[in-house]
Structures are given as structure tokens and as C-alpha cells.
């Protein structure tokens, strides 16, 4: 109990992915809870669990997902509890509870995210074309990982994990409707209407004999706000930030340079 009392403190609860201490008087982001090492216990012998008194915070291991009230609503209070249990004797347990307040969302932040979503949808074709003309694709296209705003507030695209992890939250491709990992289908985030010409997922181009139109389809969601579409299903703002279908039709130039003759 002494170890839990000493280590489960406000200073040891950080915002996920940062070293910033979470604001107990106004939580705004997801949480990284103290691991066994931080609590001074051996994970081999002790189990650490976290729980909340309300569904404003949910836990999966050491990650706490924070659900903020809708913009314009009041702040909410919740209690976060750390429970350490001896794996060999469940009666040996220690707990400690801390009080937190969850801050409502900011309408201006939501408005900015809506603008980012619209920009990502509008720029989808340009992003995957990788500098090519939609009417004359001759090389591989490029699947992106995230759309975000750069330091100058301009739309930017991440194509690699290092950048994706470094730039913070943004708009990301999510599983397309109908995807089933058990079905053996190859597409998940980037679907192609003609896989013989443009491959799914990585969008590699195989030059056809004739000029061929191909449609690429994805579904975009806000990393930060998509979860709220399910929590607040009647809120139109959140609906626009989750599962937004987008597509781009391109023409891949064939070796003949001709349009396929119509069969009569």
C-alpha cells in the first residue's frame, strides 16, 4: 500500500504520448497511467489495474481514453483508481483513488478539425497522385498515413510512420465498410476498382495496354474526434468527423496510348 500511495500521484499521470503531466482540474487528452516500474512493484508478481468511477474515462491496460463533454456543456468529475493485486493471493491488494475534472470540448477546436477534414477530402486525389496528373498516371501512386496541419497551418500529408507519430493528431484512413480480415480480401484502407492496374493498399501501378480509368476509395476519420460520433450519435458535427468516404478517379496511360476499343 505504501508504494501505491507514494507512486500513484497526479505528477505520475501523463498525457498519452507526451511527458506533460495531465491537468487534474481539466483533462483534455488521453492518459498514460503509471506502469509497474513507476509504481515500484514487479509485474511478474503483481497485477495493476485502472478504473474510473464514470464512463468519461475508459481504460485499456495503461492507456486511459478520455471522453470530454460536448462543447457548451459543463465539466464533469470522475475518480480514477489504481488497484495492485498479488497474482498469487488476490486478498493481498492495495488501492488509491484520485479526483479529476474533465473539460468540455472547445467549439473552435471542433471547427478547425472540420476544416481539416474538408481539406483532406478535397486534397485526397492530389495526395495519392504523388505529383502526377489525374488524367495521365504513368507511375506508382502513394498511399498516405495522415493528413495534418504543418507549422504554418497548411495542409500536409504524412507517408511514413516516423512523420505520422511526430505530427500529432490528424485525419487518417480507417477501415473501409465491408472490410473483413477473415475473408481473404486484400483491401482495407485503399481500395482499387481495377487491381490489375492499380494495386490495393500501396497503389502500385501496372501499365495496361489501353488507357484505363481506375477509382481509388478510402474512408477518413478524425483521430481526435471520431470516437465521439458513437458517443453522441445525434451530434451532426461528430458525424462529419467519422467514416467519411472519399474517392478519386484517375486515368492510367496504356502502352498503346489509346482508349480501349468498344466491343459492339
Would you name each region that the model predicts?
Residues 1-264:
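Beta-rich interaction/scaffold domains
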Amino acid at each position: 500500500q505504501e508504494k501505491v500511495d507514494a507512486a500513484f500521484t497526479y505528477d505520475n499521470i501523463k498525457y498519452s504520448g507526451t511527458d506533460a503531466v495531465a491537468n487534474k482540474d481539466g483533462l483534455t487528452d488521453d492518459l498514460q497511467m503509471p506502469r509497474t516500474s513507476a509504481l515500484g512493484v514487479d509485474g511478474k508478481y503483481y497485477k495493476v489495474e485502472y478504473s474510473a468511477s464514470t464512463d468519461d474515462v475508459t481504460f485499456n491496460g495503461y492507456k486511459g481514453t478520455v471522453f470530454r463533454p460536448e462543447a457548451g456543456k459543463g465539466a464533469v468529475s470522475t475518480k480514477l483508481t489504481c488497484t495492485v493485486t498479488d497474482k498469487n493471493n488476490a486478498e493481498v491488494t492495495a488501492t488509491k483513488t484520485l479526483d479529476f475534472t474533465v473539460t468540455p470540448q472547445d467549439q473552435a477546436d471542433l471547427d478547425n478539425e472540420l476544416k481539416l477534414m474538408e481539406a483532406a477530402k478535397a486534397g485526397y486525389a492530389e495526395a495519392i497522385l504523388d505529383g502526377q496528373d489525374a488524367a495521365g498516371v504513368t507511375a506508382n501512386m502513394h498511399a498516405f498515413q495522415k493528413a495534418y496541419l504543418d507549422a504554418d497551418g497548411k495542409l500536409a500529408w504524412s507517408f511514413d510512420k516516423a512523420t505520422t507519430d511526430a505530427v500529432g493528431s490528424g485525419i487518417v484512413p480507417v477501415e473501409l465498410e465491408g472490410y473483413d480480415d477473415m475473408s481473404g480480401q486484400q483491401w482495407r484502407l485503399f481500395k482499387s476498382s481495377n487491381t490489375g492496374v492499380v494495386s490495393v493498399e500501396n497503389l502500385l501501378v501496372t501499365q495496361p495496354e489501353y488507357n484505363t480509368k481506375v477509382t481509388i476509395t478510402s474512408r477518413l476519420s478524425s483521430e481526435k474526434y471520431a470516437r465521439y460520433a458513437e458517443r453522441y450519435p445525434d451530434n451532426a458535427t461528430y458525424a462529419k468527423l467519422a467514416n467519411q468516404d472519399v474517392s478519386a478517379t484517375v486515368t492510367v496511360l496504356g502502352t498503346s496510348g489509346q482508349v480501349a476499343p468498344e466491343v459492339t
